[in-house]
Amino acid sequence: MKRILAALLSFALCLALLFFVRNKSDEPILHVALKSSGEQDAAYVCETVYASGKSRACDAFTPDTCVFYTADYADFDTSALRSHRVNTLVATTLYDSVGNVVEPDETMIAMMHAAADQIDHAIFDFQIIVVNGQRYFAFVKLNVNWWDPCTLYEYEGGELRELAQWDNMRLLSIGFI
């Protein structure tokens, strides 16, 4: 009986070790400045985003040059298909930070198509952030029942890669580490 118990304990320890070894590294990849969407007077918060998808509070940082573009609310159409939601890109209207309509480049249009293909909830707000004129990010607010998930994605290789998620926040800036 003791041997069986010892073998089970050893097996459980090996599984736990395997789980921790296979876990994504907690390497910091970038800083973000965020502000609560619900409160006008709320202070902004700075967080470090890690490769594992986690984010933690950090000190103030120097942001990189970020240009924000916001998709028109009618660019994405959401419908229910069988047991899940399907997003369809119906237009590619983008606005700059002043509210002027801008012509999206090929990468921005590809990002919008990737969002429609990859995201399985109704897209409430879609922002494209071009950092230093080279790297593309998307900040997507979804229409989900009891909360407003806001997810930061990096666009690379034709796909959106999820970096981190918050509840009901606005992205103000990004700074590379």
Q: Where are the predicted features?
A:
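Structural motif
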Residues: S55, P63-F68, W146-L152
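Positively charged n-region of N-terminal signal peptides that target proteins for export
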Residues: M1-I4
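Sec-dependent signal peptide cleavage junction
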Residues: L18-P28
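Hydrophobic membrane-insertion alpha-helices, especially the h-region
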Residues: A7-F19
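Short loop/turn segments that connect beta-strands within beta-propeller blades
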Residues: E156-G158
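Surface-exposed loop and turn segments in beta-propeller and other repeat-based domains
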Residues: R82-D117, M169-F176
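Structural signature of eukaryotic scaffold interfaces centered on beta-propeller domains
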Residues: I29-E39, F124-G133, G175-I177
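Short beta-strand elements that form the blades of beta-propeller/WD-repeat-like
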Residues: A33, D41-S52, R56-A60, V67, ...
